[in-house]
From Swiss-Prot:
Function statement: Receptor for lysophosphatidic acid (LPA), a mediator of diverse cellular activities.
Glycosylation sites: 4, 170
Disulphide bridges: 93-174
Intracellular or extracellular location(s): Cell membrane
GO biological process annotation, one example: behavioral response to pain
Species annotation: Bos taurus (Bovine)
Protein's name according to its UniProt entry: Lysophosphatidic acid receptor 5
Length: 367
């Protein structure tokens, strides 16, 4: 246990956060169990199988990397919520807090870039075609990472663990409340700036671009094709993630920041209630890393075909193994022995080529 005893001042008694810690422990365990393999597989598919040829796959690859980074930090949070105190060095508390903010704002921006790319491809296919190149997409993603890293610096500085007393001992808390002095100082302006650049602008861009695309595709002269259906699924999935994961958390966070900064007068009881809501909404924001892989699967044909290609050799090897076991169970007559050798050799010498199940295309129709 990390104990920071001080002879100068006795810390206050630790608040009872155990009920909300138990909720976070359950939800984040599910997010880790599902999000880690899903995003690791997605990143492997984009980098190794699809080779990130299309513009949308570039954005999806970076989105998967952001989600994977967050899921890798979850064991620190799970240990904290299980023990109800921070047992690690202080810098890991700061790092885990910064990774969450980077993932949330990074996910908002990467989803926005996906939507804007669909807007450029369907509403302005000729005017904006120079922006729809993989090289431009990679430069934009590099700029996004630079932006969220810059905003991570004040987050790291603000996420200092706080000390309190529990059972006669000093313990450290993480991911809880910042001090009133910090809220009234530089934290609130930084929060509002991050909300404007990392959430409000992306939300406005997603709503506008999705609306224009839906309007264009709904016209009587619009081409009805499989590409149209994929685009609609992709945009709807992005809207659902924004409305379900990001809007509730960011709206509650803005209200809580205004209350803590005393921009809006409120009683301490009202602030506690808003904080309780915020602690639930943060779970929705963290759950986006489980929903994003569903966007890849249902919207990206190349991604789906790759997963089918991975399943094919596994199925063939299972069938070959079952055939060999059945042959060994038969009486070892000369005919049965010959049949067994034939079946087994075919299963070994003619495996399914996992690359033959799909042909990744460089066009948008295969994103």
């Amino acid at each position: 246990m990390q104990a920071n005893s001080s002879a100068k001042s006795l810390p206050t008694e630790c608040p009872d956060y155990q009920p909300i810690h138990h909720l976070h422990l359950v939800v984040y365990s599910v997010v880790l169990a599902a999000g880690l393999p899903l995003n690791a597989l997605a990143l492997w598919v984009f980098l190794r199988a699809l080779r990130v040829h299309s513009v949308v796959s570039v954005y999806m690859c970076n989105l998967a990397a952001s989600d994977l980074l967050f899921t890798l930090s979850l064991p620190l949070r799970l240990s904290y919520y299980a023990r109800h105190y921070w047992p690690f060095p202080d810098f890991l508390c700061q790092l885990a807090g910064a990774v969450f903010q980077m993932n949330m704002y990074g996910s908002c921006i990467f989803l926005t870039l996906i939507n804007v790319d669909r807007y450029a491809a369907i509403v302005h296919p000729l005017r904006l075609r120079h922006l729809r190149r993989p090289r431009v997409a990679r430069l934009l993603c590099l700029g996004v990472w630079a932006l969220i890293l810059v905003f991570a610096v004040p987050t790291i500085l603000a996420h200092q663990p706080s000390s309190c007393a529990r059972d006669g001992r000093n313990v450290s808390l993480c991911f809880e409340s910042f001090s009133d002095k910090l809220w009234k100082g530089s934290l609130l302006p930084l929060l509002l700036l991050a909300e404007a650049l990392g959430f409000l602008l992306p939300l406005a861009a997603v709503v506008y671009s999705s609306g224009r695309v839906f309007w264009t595709l709904a016209r009587p002269d619009a081409t009805r094709s499989q590409r149209r259906r994929k685009t609609v699924r992709l945009l709807l999935a992005s809207l659902v993630i924004f409305l379900l994961c990001f809007v509730p958390y960011n709206a509650t966070l803005a209200v809580y920041g205004l209350l803590r900064g005393e921009v809006v007068p409120a009683s301490s009881e009202a602030r506690k209630k808003v904080r309780g809501v915020l602690m639930v909404m943060v779970l929705l924001a963290g759950a986006n890393c489980v929903l994003d892989p569903l966007v890849y699967y249902f919207s990206a044909e190349g991604f789906r075909n790759t997963l089918r290609g991975l399943r094919a050799p596994l199925r063939d090897r299972t069938l070959a193994a079952n055939g060999a076991q059945e042959a060994l169970a038969e009486p070892l007559t000369e005919t049965a022995h010959a049949s067994t050798l034939t079946t087994t050799s075919q299963g070994q010498l003619q495996p399914s080529d996992p690359r033959s199940s799909f042909t990744p295309s460089h066009e948008d129709s295969s994103f």
